[in-house]
UniProtKB/Swiss-Prot annotation:
Protein function: May be involved in transcriptional regulation.
GO biological process: regulation of transcription by RNA polymerase II
PANTHER family noted in UniProt: ZINC FINGER PROTEIN, ZINC FINGER PROTEIN 564
Protein name per the record: Zinc finger protein 791
GO MF assignments: DNA-binding transcription factor activity, RNA polymerase II-specific; RNA polymerase II transcription regulatory region sequence-specific DNA binding; zinc ion binding
GO CC annotations on file: nucleus
Family (UniProt): Belongs to the krueppel C2H2-type zinc-finger protein family.
Keywords: DNA-binding, Metal-binding, Nucleus, Repeat, Transcription, Transcription regulation, Zinc, Zinc-finger
Name of the gene encoding the protein in the UniProt record: ZNF791
InterPro entries the record matches: Ikaros_C2H2-ZF, KRAB, KRAB_dom_sf, Znf_C2H2_sf, Znf_C2H2_type
Subcellular location as annotated: Nucleus
Positions annotated as zinc finger (C2H2-type): 100-122, 132-154, 160-182, 188-210, 216-238, 244-266, 272-294, 300-322, 328-350, 356-378, 384-406, 412-434, 440-462, 468-490, 496-518, 524-546, 552-574
Species of provenance: Homo sapiens (Human)
Pfam families recorded: KRAB, zf-C2H2
Domain KRAB: 4-90
């Protein structure tokens, strides 16, 4: 049986605190203390029925808070001091008994002090006032110690310092939790999944993942949360409060996590590194989730369909597929989203915000994924490698499409002519030949395009803009893909090799045209005479015969020709 000290079942006041109590509050205190003595007597201890009121009649008596000292000590060893001896103890009959019950809500407590603190949560039923008021923010406290701890949030004082890493803390409890991260101590284990946690409060919050309990409900929208900190952050979406500001650019955020994530764009600091692949993270929790990619662990399982997830937030978002819940609604267009990241990215469509800026060229992006992919154009990094031929790519989609060259898969088929394609982009481009229609139209010449990027590149043929310059020879290009291909003329790289004859090519179009010599394929057919060609350039030259088009003119005599070979032959006449 556990032994408890008298302080465990008592509540006390300093002389100053007692003076602040109203007569009705003093009466309540006496009633509660007398009830305590009755409880003690009922479990076998002999207690004299004290006159509680007499404790406070003598001004010289010293009532002390819970410091291990006597609750009430008379100057000359009065009867009061005898009755309140700190060495007295009682024995619990049954472990886990909670004898102190709140008369307002029925909640029970092990200690009377816990009950008295709880009673203050009920409006109009405070045991006593909160005499300690903060001058900075006007927050009031019942206890001097609580007030002193709060003051540190304004002064910045952090008296608890970790000997391992030097990190400092305002409060003792977070300091204790932090120390466990060094020794790896996690004494609180979940009975459902076996996950171990460093503190009891974290275990309680974690257990709600299994039970589905969400005790914290937003009064504005009714949304419920499993954790008190989550509802505090959520409430700011209604109030518009953003208390965490970036010191670099002044941008404000609703949560501390958000501002730390944002800070990466300035300093790139990621202290938590994966031992498997070297990837770094801002928070240890992010690293733990990432490590599950390597271990294959997926501890969060959907009760509806059985699908498992590495991260608790992922399962929460997934569950909305079953419920149909889309809590994030755009105020501009009314579109709703099930996940906050998708909603935030969408909002930038309206605001035009592009928070991710490239330090090399100044180009800005609305998504961090787009920004990271763009960075590879400067670093030359191509992390996605084909296991068949060793070719590397910037993007995973490019690798996926490339693999179809090896497998022969062409999943996109034209319903008009039954022609098939390895990529959706090629298929859409082909469809324009049938429909003559595309969503992006050039204002100068009326040419249509499927993608806005293709239109932008095309517009440069009108403006003459060539933003991509070769560092080797200074030649400039209107498109990034053109400069990549051009660089091969300097390096000698010829990545496109014919398996039939071994001939290699710099340009993919040259390689494709060459392959048709072996296959005999001639996809470009003249509508006028029915003649077919393996190369598009040959087809274009041929159509000039029917159109009587002669775009190539001799500078010497002005004679015009439809093809370059005829012009070259003619030029030899002048050079004789």
């Amino acid at each position: 049986m556990d032994s408890v000290a008298f302080e465990d079942v008592s509540v006390s006041f300093s002389q100053e605190e007692w003076a602040l109590l109203a007569p009705s509050q003093k009466k309540l205190y006496r009633d509660v203390m007398q009830e305590t003595f009755k409880n003690l007597a009922s479990i076998g201890e002999k207690w004299e029925d004290p006159n509680v009121e007499d404790q406070h009649k003598n001004q010289g008596r010293n009532l002390r808070s819970h410091t291990g000292e006597r609750l009430c000590e008379g100057k000359e060893g009065s009867q009061c001091a005898e009755n309140f001896s700190p060495n007295l103890s009682v024995t619990k009959k049954t472990a886990g008994v909670k004898p102190y019950e709140c008369t307002i809500c029925g909640k029970a407590f092990m200690r009377l002090s816990s009950l008295t603190r709880h009673m203050r949560s009920h409006t109009g039923y405070e045991l006593f006032e909160k005499p300690y008021k903060c001058k900075e923010c006007e927050k009031a406290f019942s206890y001097l110690k609580s007030f002193q701890r709060h003051e540190r949030s304004h002064t910045g004082e952090k008296p608890y310092k970790c000997k391992q890493c030097g990190k400092t803390f305002i409060y003792h409890q977070p300091f204790q939790r932090h120390e466990r991260t060094h020794i790896g101590e996690k004494p609180y284990e979940c009975k459902q999944c076996g996950k171990a946690l460093s503190c009891s409060s974290s275990l309680r919050v974690h257990e709600r993942i299994h039970t589905g309990e969400k005790p914290y409900e937003c009064k504005q929208c009714g949304k419920a949360f499993s954790c008190s900190s989550s509802i505090r952050v959520h409430e700011r979406t209604h109030t518009g409060e953003k208390p965490y500001a970036c010191k670099e650019c002044g941008k404000a955020f609703i949560s501390h996590t958000s501002v730390l994530t944002h800070m990466i764009t300035h300093n790139g600091d990621r202290p938590y590194k994966c031992k498997e692949c070297g990837k770094a993270f801002i928070f240890p929790s992010f690293l733990r989730v990432h490590e599950r990619i390597h271990t294959g662990e997926k501890p969060y399982k959907c009760k509806q369909c059985g699908k498992a997830f590495r991260c608790s937030t992922s399962i929460q978002i997934h569950e909305r597929i079953h419920t149909g819940e889309k809590p994030y609604k755009c105020k501009e267009c009314g579109k709703s989203f099930s996940a906050r990241p998708a909603f935030r990215v969408h909002v930038r469509v309206h605001t035009g915000e592009k928070p991710y800026k490239c330090k090399e060229c100044g180009k800005a992006f609305s998504r961090i994924s787009y920004f990271r992919i763009h960075e590879r154009t400067h670093t030359g990094e191509k992390p996605y490698e084909c296991k068949k031929c060793g070719k590397t790519f910037n993007y995973p989609l490019d690798l996926k499409i490339h693999k179809r060259n090896h497998t022969g898969e062409k999943p996109y088929e034209c319903k008009e002519c039954a022609k098939t394609f390895i990529s959706l982009e090629n298929f859409r481009r082909h469809m324009i030949t049938h429909t003559g229609d595309g969503p992006y139209k050039c204002r100068d010449c009326g040419k249509v395009f499927i993608f806005p990027s293709a239109l932008r590149t095309h517009e440069r043929t009108h403006t003459g803009e060539k933003p991509y310059e070769c560092k080797q020879c200074g030649k400039a290009f209107s498109c990034s893909s053109y400069i990549r291909i051009h660089k091969r003329t300097h390096t000698g790289e010829k990545p496109y090799e014919c398996k039939e004859c071994g001939k290699a090519f710099i340009y993919p179009t040259s390689f494709q045209g060459h392959m048709r010599m072996h296959t005999g394929e001639k996809p470009y057919k003249c509508k006028e005479c029915g003649k077919a060609f393996s190369l598009h350039s040959s087809f274009q030259r041929h159509t000039r015969i029917h159109n009587y088009e002669k775009p190539l003119e001799c500078k010497q005599c002005g004679k015009a020709f439809s093809v370059s070979t005829s012009l070259k032959k003619h030029m030899r006449m002048h050079n004789r």
